[in-house]
Amino acid sequence: MSVDKKWVIFDLDGTLANIETRRKIAKKPDGKMDWEIFFADKLIEHDEPNEPVIKMAQALKASGYNIAILSGRSKSSKQVTAEWLKKHGVEYNILKMRPTSHPWKFMPDEELKLGWFNDLFAGDENRDEHEVVCVFDDRQKVVDMWREIGLTCMQVAPGDF
């Protein structure tokens, strides 16, 4: 199989982007997360790059692999997200972000990403020629899902949330 049919999937928050500062700012006094603050564009644009993971994405892209970024982040942040990825030198073929409409808005990340994965090559008459080589993610539930469907998943950080 030629490398042009090979894909690597990356998560965004906690994987390509270090979100610790944003997480601290958005944490309420009771310890719960204020998701409106957490996903505010003005905070997203200041995320620090997770350099080792970004270097992997760059090396894989330079070697001819296709890059798909599947993020639970809202589609309403697509512009600031695309600008952040460009600023940090992350090239990609596909960027999927959570739709703002129901039922997608509240769907667990592992269900959302499995749905996207199942539709990734839909409509391509050569669908069976594509291969997902591996996945980079941080969230345990999502990592477990990738592994359950038989994909190799590189867990880049602890993600029990």
Residue map of PLM features:
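Alpha-helical substrate-recognition element adjacent to the catalytic core
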Residues: 2-103
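Conserved Lys-Pro-Asp/Glu-containing loop-to-beta segment of HAD-superfamily phosphomonoesterases
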Residues: 4, 113-140
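Surface-exposed amphipathic alpha-helices with a cationic face
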Residues: 57-61, 118-121, 147
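Short, aromatic/basic amphipathic alpha-helical patches
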Residues: 81-89, 120, 144-150
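Short, surface-exposed, polar/charged, turn-prone segments marking secondary-structure boundaries
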Residues: 95-98, 127, 161
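Acidic, Mg2+-coordinating phosphoryl-transfer loop and its flanking beta/alpha structural elements
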Residues: 130-161
